[in-house]
Regions:
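Bacterial N-terminal signal peptides that target proteins for export
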Residues: 1-9
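Bacterial N-terminal signal peptides
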Residues: 9-20
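Bacterial Sec-dependent signal peptides at the C-terminal "C-region" and cleavage site
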Residues: 19-29
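Beta-strand-enriched cores of mature, soluble protein domains
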Residues: 27-155
Length: 155
């Protein structure tokens, strides 16, 4: 009976360690919530006209633009992604993109408005941003020539 308890105890310890290691690997590289601000310079945006000629549902917007720091002076990475036009009348797109920085990537997804600031869901990350969640707000500057992106990231 004592031998059986030792085996059960050993199995429980191994399981606990396994779950503990799994939980440890699921943590983010950032230790506490952070706010990260970058500026996107929209120099490569291209709309692919699909279906009805002109601005119409289903059109695709692609981009691969440079990102600059919060002072908008030093290049810190790139941003690449795409959007599908959902409603020309409402001025909305459904978008997903990845911000690539030296220490990792952050992906976002959600609806984008041509006419107002927009909030996106942070859907994940790599590097020091592994397993982050949170939100990102986009603010158009200079008529959309630049976009201020403010990430609120939670580990």
């Amino acid at each position: 009976m004592a031998r059986k308890l030792e085996i059960v105890g050993a199995v429980m310890v191994v399981c606990a360690l396994g779950f503990g290691l799994g939980a440890a690997s699921a943590t983010s590289g950032i230790a506490s919530p952070i706010t990260l601000t970058v500026f996107e310079h929209s120099t490569t945006d291209k709309v692919i006209d699909v279906g009805t000629h002109g601005d119409s549902t289903g059109d695709i917007l692609t981009f691969h633009n440079k990102l600059f720091d919060e002072t908008d002076t030093t290049k810190v990475g790139t941003l690449q992604g795409q959007c599908v036009r959902e409603s020309p009348r409402a001025g909305t797109w459904e978008c997903w993109w990845t911000m690539s920085l030296a220490d990792g990537q952050v992906t976002v997804e959600g609806p984008f408005s041509d006419t107002s600031d927009t909030d996106f869901a942070v859907t994940g990350g790599t590097g020091i941003y592994e397993n982050v969640r949170g939100s990102m707000q986009v603010e158009a500057i200079n008529g959309g020539a630049e976009y201020k992106q403010t990430f609120s990231l939670i580990p």
